Every structure is written in C-alpha cells, then in structure tokens.
Amino acid sequence: SIDIWAYNLETVLAEKLETILSRATTNTRMRDFYDLHILSQLHGSGIVPGDLAAALDATARKRGSEKYLPDALAVCDEVENSPVMLELWSAYQKKFSYASDISWTTVMESVRNLYRMCQGR
C-alpha cells in the first residue's frame, strides 16, 4: 500500500489566510489571494468553520503570528485599499487569464468572509 499525505481544505485555506494577514501589504504572492478566493467559491459550503478556525490558530501559533489575528479585518482594509496591491493584482490578472474577470474587491471580500467564518466558529 502507498500512504498519501494531504492537507485538508481548512488547513490549506488557513495557511494562505495567515500569510495574507501576517504579511499584509508586503505580500506580493497574488496566487495566495487567488487560491483563497477560488477555493472558497468552489468549496465554500464544505468548509467546517470550527476546523478552519482551529487550523488558523494552529498555523499562527506555529509561525509566531498570533498577534496579527485580532486586527485581521483592519489588515484586510489596508490591503484592499493599497494602490500597490491593486497594481499587483492587475498585473496578475494580465498574466493569468483565469483571474481576469475577478475584481480585487471580490477577492478581498473572500478573504474577509473566511476570517469572519473563523470568528463565528
């Protein structure tokens, strides 16, 4: 038999969410934003809020970034309103056609919604 190791959806989302929240406007990895948005759109109904919250807490503890979580929504506002981040998203859209019709506002709303899901547990 072959063992296959895999992360569950909540862990994948939590790792990307933690990266977005802890790096804020220094995160140039637009793929994290896209992945978080598209995974939440495709699999949103299957996300278990308690599992997502636990995975986010565990990821933040492991990475030493717990201090960023209480200000997550303010960080989202800062990221969304950053002209540099919008420019990076526009460049990502031009490079990858699959993202061309997804607005920056829509992507950031997905980020906020996933964080709110953690708060609601």
Predicted features along the sequence, with ranges:
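Structured mid-to-C-terminal alpha-helical surface segments
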Residues: 1-121
